[in-house]
Amino acid sequence: MQLRQVIIAYKAGDPTSKAAADDCAHCLESQGIHVMLGPSGARDNPFPVFLASATEPIDLAIVLGGDGTVLAAARHLSDAGIPLLTFNVGGHLGFLTQPRDFFQPEAELWDRLRNDQYAVEQRMMLAASLHEGGRENREPISETYYALNDMCVKPAAPDRMSVCILEMEVDGEIIDQYQGDGLIVSTPTGSTCYTAAAHGPIVHPGVDALAVTPICAMSLSSRPIVIPPRSVVSVWPLGTQDPTIKLWMDGVLATSIWPGQRVDIRMAEKPAQFLVLDSDRSFYRILREKLQWAGAVIHYNNNFRN
């Protein structure tokens, strides 16, 4: 990997993350590498400025923070093919980050990158767009929205807790009409987040699939479903004349869905690329440790396993 121009995004409002980002930027600049540095958070989005002001291809994005910081970076940078190197600095759960122990902004780290001493983990992204008219109308009326974890269609009203009726089609075929709090379309990466909280399936990130999970459906027969990755999920809001139904990308508001509109959700053309330094990184170990599965807190001796 060449290191000529590097993005450093840190968790907005977190002094630990900012201090680590400043140290990292100083180390890179001392090697003649052009650095673009900025905070990322609910009120800070540096990525459009980074992309617009780049004078040459961006080789790497270093993300210092928690999962929310990583999700924002993936949404904005994956379509440009910029790899992400993420560390849990100032974050909480850190499901999508490497431990801070691996963040040592010294010559050894940069030498590893230059010598390609890392693994590349590709994670599916989702793309969503709004459409009007019949299902045969494939021309979008909105920009394309991206998500690493999930796209969620659910209502949001300022003065009441709303339920909604959503019709879901897969590749033009009606699957169900859900009455409840909403619908989640998730990648395998996102299956351990909102989908898991809604009692949906946990899908290994090495599996190419989409998971569709209703949120608090009023019918006990409305169940989660796992579908092929090339499927197009179309969601139509029904039974309302107000634009209270919203599209959410990784928990961030994307847009309102007006009556008569539908949202099409599919696998994005380009995945997010994560650089992995931990040679012992294991999805199953992350499940045990981050989700506190019983294996992490209950220890029985298995004398049958060699």
Curated annotation (Swiss-Prot):
Its main location: cytoplasm. It is found in: Cytoplasm. Keywords: ATP-binding, Cytoplasm, Kinase, NAD, NADP, Nucleotide-binding, Transferase. NAD(+) binds at D67, G68, N149, D150, D181. Its EC number is 2.7.1.23. The active site is at D67 (proton acceptor). GO terms for cellular component: cytoplasm. InterPro entries: ATP-NAD_kinase_N, ATP-NAD_kinase_PpnK-typ_C, NAD/diacylglycerol_kinase_sf, NADK. It holds the Pfam family NAD_kinase_C. It comes from the Bacteria. Gene3D superfamilies: Probable inorganic polyphosphate/atp-NAD kinase, domain 1 (3.40.50.10330), Probable inorganic polyphosphate/atp-NAD kinase, domain 2 (2.60.200.30). It catalyses: NAD(+) + ATP = ADP + NADP(+) + H(+). One of its GO terms (biological process) is NADP biosynthetic process. Its cofactor is a divalent metal cation. It is an enzyme of class 2 (transferase). GO terms for molecular function: ATP binding; metal ion binding; NAD binding; NAD+ kinase activity. NCBIfam families: PRK02645.1. Belongs to the NAD kinase family. Involved in the regulation of the intracellular balance of NAD and NADP, and is a key enzyme in the biosynthesis of NADP. Catalyzes specifically the phosphorylation on 2'-hydroxyl of the adenosine moiety of NAD to yield NADP. This is NAD kinase 1. The lineage of its organism: Bacteria, Bacillati, Cyanobacteriota, Cyanophyceae, Synechococcales. The gene is nadK1.
